């Protein structure tokens, strides 16, 4: 049995000092009774909770259910709705002005193609054109290289029909396309 140590702080008030002295004497008496050879009730922490009868000890159920009830089961039942919402309340919730779709005032026309788009956002139609042209260029590069890991470590230049390589294009990989350069694809 490990030795225990109790630290007492003596309060300055005489009434509290007397109460503390009485408690200390009772504790000493109980500790002396609990020595080996004396029978005493087991010491240990105890928890006393006042609650509804739902939390009392479960009765022996012989119906064969192996499921034990717990505190969480009753908490989940407490969180269930008790009354049905009226149709008026539901309508107010559904038609709340904060839940309605907000009108967008940042819609503009694309200067290239004329389709509607959001301001400061690339037009979806123009983006699709760029994506298709880029996919064609990548497909042609794949045919020219012969594999995904055989790419040279030089810069790539795309030349369309009727264009010739300039002095800056010397030593670069040149991809030639057999069509006219699109207006949105600049040469530099």
UniProtKB/Swiss-Prot annotation:
<keyword id="KW-0479">Metal-binding</keyword>
<feature type="compositionally biased region" description="Basic and acidic residues">
    <location>
        <begin position="165"/>
        <end position="181"/>
    </location>
</feature>
<keyword id="KW-0496">Mitochondrion</keyword>
<keyword id="KW-0687">Ribonucleoprotein</keyword>
<keyword id="KW-0689">Ribosomal protein</keyword>
<keyword id="KW-0862">Zinc</keyword>
<feature type="region of interest" description="Disordered">
    <location>
        <begin position="162"/>
        <end position="188"/>
    </location>
</feature>
<comment type="similarity">
    <text>Belongs to the bacterial ribosomal protein bL32 family.</text>
</comment>
<dbReference type="GO" id="GO:0005762">
    <property type="term" value="C:mitochondrial large ribosomal subunit"/>
</dbReference>
<protein>
    <recommendedName>
        <fullName>Large ribosomal subunit protein bL32m</fullName>
    </recommendedName>
</protein>
<keyword id="KW-0809">Transit peptide</keyword>
<feature type="binding site">
    <location>
        <position position="110"/>
    </location>
    <ligand>
        <name>Zn(2+)</name>
    </ligand>
</feature>
<dbReference type="GO" id="GO:0003735">
    <property type="term" value="F:structural constituent of ribosome"/>
</dbReference>
<dbReference type="GO" id="GO:0006412">
    <property type="term" value="P:translation"/>
</dbReference>
<dbReference type="InterPro" id="IPR011332">
    <property type="entry name" value="Ribosomal_zn-bd"/>
</dbReference>
<feature type="binding site">
    <location>
        <position position="126"/>
    </location>
    <ligand>
        <name>Zn(2+)</name>
    </ligand>
</feature>
<comment type="subunit">
    <text>Component of the mitochondrial ribosome large subunit (39S) which comprises a 16S rRNA and about 50 distinct proteins.</text>
</comment>
<dbReference type="GO" id="GO:0046872">
    <property type="term" value="F:metal ion binding"/>
</dbReference>
<feature type="binding site">
    <location>
        <position position="113"/>
    </location>
    <ligand>
        <name>Zn(2+)</name>
    </ligand>
</feature>
<dbReference type="InterPro" id="IPR051991">
    <property type="entry name" value="Mitoribosomal_protein_bL32"/>
</dbReference>
<dbReference type="Pfam" id="PF01783">
    <property type="entry name" value="Ribosomal_L32p"/>
</dbReference>
<comment type="function">
    <text>Component of the mitochondrial large ribosomal subunit (mt-LSU). The mitochondrial ribosome (mitoribosome) is a large ribonucleoprotein complex responsible for the synthesis of proteins inside mitochondria.</text>
</comment>
<feature type="binding site">
    <location>
        <position position="123"/>
    </location>
    <ligand>
        <name>Zn(2+)</name>
    </ligand>
</feature>
<dbReference type="GO" id="GO:0005743">
    <property type="term" value="C:mitochondrial inner membrane"/>
</dbReference>
<dbReference type="InterPro" id="IPR002677">
    <property type="entry name" value="Ribosomal_bL32"/>
</dbReference>
